A protein has these predicted regions:
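Short beta-strand element of the alpha/beta-hydrolase
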Residues: 102-110
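Conserved alpha/beta-hydrolase
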Residues: 126-145
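An N-terminal hydrophobic leader/cap segment in hydrolases
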Residues: 30-83
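The serine-hydrolase catalytic nucleophile loop
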Residues: 112-124
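Conserved small/polar residues in nucleotide/adenosyl-binding loops
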Residues: 206-207
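Alpha/beta-hydrolase active-site loop
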Residues: 150-170
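Alpha/beta-hydrolase fold nucleophile elbow
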Residues: 172-181
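Short glycine-enriched nucleophile-adjacent loop
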Residues: 185-196
């Protein structure tokens, strides 16, 4: 009787072990799947990519208008600015001066956009108002360095670095406004809790 009970007990132990192993196997597969999905999502969302401008020959009417304006802006006389971010990444922007001591708009484009096509209406408005304009390439975009977009985590410090550059270059008497579209707008807002120059007067945001 004792041997029979021991045999039954051993069988139960074996069954329980198998169940535990199956559960552990399922959990391991689930974790590996989640890690794979996370890695894919990170690479798709955050790793640097080279995005070409759409071909004018196949653009629809709206795209054609935006692109032709963007090409004009790109070719307008401007001053190319390169600064070093707080983590050593080289950042590039283009400064368009309309009037000395006028307010400076620092513009940040959206994720995987560029400072020209994302900026056409703003460029024309600042031109009419004779405000000076600094078009910034976000890190991991276009002319700027960096391999990863951090979706605003590090970019907000870059925003502060650009504001500091404008303040140092033109003096604290020149008003600065931070402006962005989509993720660029988020970058401008996220930078507002940092120690910005006193010449920064506000944020102007736009999102679709």
């Amino acid at each position: 009787m004792n041997l029979q009970c021991m045999g039954i007990a051993m069988m139960k132990i074996c069954v329980n072990r198998r169940r535990i192993l199956i559960i552990l196997l399922i959990l391991s597969i689930g974790i590996l799947t989640l890690l794979g999905i996370s890695k894919y999502s990170f690479q798709k969302a955050c790793l640097r990519r080279e995005i070409r401008w759409p071909d004018l020959g196949i653009a629809d009417d709206w795209q054609y208008e935006i692109l032709t304006e963007a090409y004009k802006i790109k070719n307008e006389p401007n001053r190319k600015i390169t600064i070093t971010a707080s983590d050593g990444v080289q950042l590039v922007g283009h400064y368009y001066e309309r009037k000395k001591n006028a307010p400076v708009i620092i513009f940040f484009h959206g994720l995987w956009g560029n400072c020209y096509t994302n900026n056409v209406p703003i460029y024309r408005i600042t031109e009419e108002k004779e405000w000076n304009l600094l078009l910034v390439n976000l890190r991991a975009h276009n002319e700027s360095g960096g391999d990863v977009s951090t979706l605003g985590v590090l970019e907000r410090y870059d925003c502060r670095d650009w504001a500091n550059w404008v303040d140092f270059e033109f003096g604290e008497q020149v008003p600065i406004f931070l402006m962005g579209i989509s993720m660029g707008g988020a970058v401008a807002v996220m930078s507002s809790d940092l120690e910005l120059p006193e010449s920064v007067c506000g944020c102007l945001l736009y999102t679709s």
